[in-house]
């Protein structure tokens, strides 16, 4: 059974609109967040966390940009402070029918990892064409070529897509985006981490955030 295509069939694109809350700068500690009891992570305490209404607006903006419906609203969206943000994280949960478990994914990867990666790449090429066409109308371009992997994150196995795009704040800069698709049975967790390439502070924040993730 080809699970890679099913996992990516409701591909979720990361639209990084700059809708943020104004918050006062704090001394930088870290805040532990628990998203729906399934994904835990830590972000710097001076980051901005988008509220439900903002997340809904980002979803609607994404639909407007690419002209296709987005099947979910992010459960968590947070970004570095101050704006324009240099590091961002989004966590979403997307229903999967039929369910695909971690055991299913591990079994398929063990049987033929290269085929899983080929299927992942094929699905991305098919699904992302509309996204890039929509983003291009708004001045956002793809940078370089995407890469694909199957790796653990937070104690679970993820199908991973990495791509670059021009920054919405500064087209001369590249935003590096990594999508982690993590099947969890009846739903998948989609964790999207983004940072500005070449910004050492943004890269360090990204790496620390990634290492803090625990998925149940």
Set out the residue ranges of the language-model regions:
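Bacterial N-terminal signal peptides that target proteins for export
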Residues: 1-11
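Bacterial N-terminal signal peptides
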Residues: 10-19
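N-terminal "mature-domain start" segment
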Residues: 25-75
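Solvent-exposed, acidic/flexible segments
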Residues: 36, 117, 121, 174, ...
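Extracytoplasmic/secreted proteins, especially bacterial periplasmic and envelope-associated proteins
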Residues: 38, 42, 130, 204-208
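A mature extracytoplasmic/lumenal domain signature
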Residues: 45-47, 53-54, 93-95, 162-165, ...
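Surface-exposed amphipathic alpha-helical segments
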Residues: 47, 185-216
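Conserved polar/disulfide-associated segments of primarily extracytoplasmic proteins
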Residues: 54-176
């Amino acid at each position: 059974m080809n699970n890679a295509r099913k996992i990516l069939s409701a591909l979720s694109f990361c639209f990084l609109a700059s809708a943020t809350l104004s918050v006062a700068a704090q001394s930088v500690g870290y805040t532990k967040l628990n998203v729906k009891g399934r994904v835990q992570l830590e972000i710097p305490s001076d980051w901005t966390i988008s509220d439900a209404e903002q997340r809904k607006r980002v979803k609607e903006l994404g639909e407007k940009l690419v002209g296709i419906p987005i099947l979910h609203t992010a459960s968590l969206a947070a970004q570095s402070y101050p704006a324009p943000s240099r590091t961002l994280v989004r966590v979403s949960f997307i229903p999967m029918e039929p369910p695909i478990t971690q055991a299913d994914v591990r079994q398929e990867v063990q049987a033929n990892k290269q085929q899983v990666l080929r299927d992942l790449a094929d699905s991305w090429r098919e699904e992302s064409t509309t996204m890039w066409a929509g983003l291009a109308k708004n001045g956002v371009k793809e940078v370089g070529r995407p890469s694909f992997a199957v790796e653990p994150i937070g104690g679970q196995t993820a199908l991973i897509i990495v791509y670059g795009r021009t920054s919405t704040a500064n087209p001369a800069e590249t935003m590096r985006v990594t999508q982690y698709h993590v099947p969890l049975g009846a739903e998948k967790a989609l964790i999207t981490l983004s940072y500005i390439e070449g910004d050492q502070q943004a890269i360090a924040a990204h790496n620390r955030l990634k290492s803090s993730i625990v998925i149940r």
